[in-house]
């Protein structure tokens, strides 16, 4: 948990206006579909901030921010990987490449994206739907 939660100006100053817009659109899309607890943390060694979407002790996804960069991470477990692989042709080539290049750990395949625009937003939301059905009507 962070001592001071970053505000809009803090994130904008860190990532820049265009990436802040990507961050905002991604958060809005997730918030529209999912009722989740949102938790701010430090981003560890590689990132300045982590903004995690969780519910019932399970993480849906996390957004990361560092200087001039935004990250979006989703971890797919064994069953979720099977669902992705059965429908992989529905995803863009760049999402398939990140999937193929991502390391598989004991708890799943960690997919880290560094979006520069909103072109992959639909793919990101499909990945989240594999993990959890949207719970907002």
Residues covered by each model-derived region:
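Charge-dense, helix-prone N-terminal extensions
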Residues: 1-137
């Amino acid at each position: 948990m962070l001592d001071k939660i970053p505000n809009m100006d803090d994130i904008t100053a860190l990532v820049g206006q265009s990436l802040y817009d990507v961050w905002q659109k991604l958060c809005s899309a997730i918030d529209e579909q999912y009722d989740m607890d949102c938790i701010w943390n430090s981003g560890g060694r590689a990132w300045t901030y982590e903004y995690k979407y969780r519910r019932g002790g399970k993480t849906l996804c996390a957004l990361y921010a560092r200087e001039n960069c935004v990250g979006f991470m989703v971890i797919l477990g064994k069953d979720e990987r099977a669902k992705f692989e059965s429908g992989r042709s529905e995803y863009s080539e760049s999402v398939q490449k990140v999937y193929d290049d991502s390391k598989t750990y004991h708890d799943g395949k960690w997919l880290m994206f560094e979006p520069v625009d909103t072109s992959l937003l639909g793919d990101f939301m499909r990945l989240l739907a594999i993990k959890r059905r949207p719970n907002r009507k």
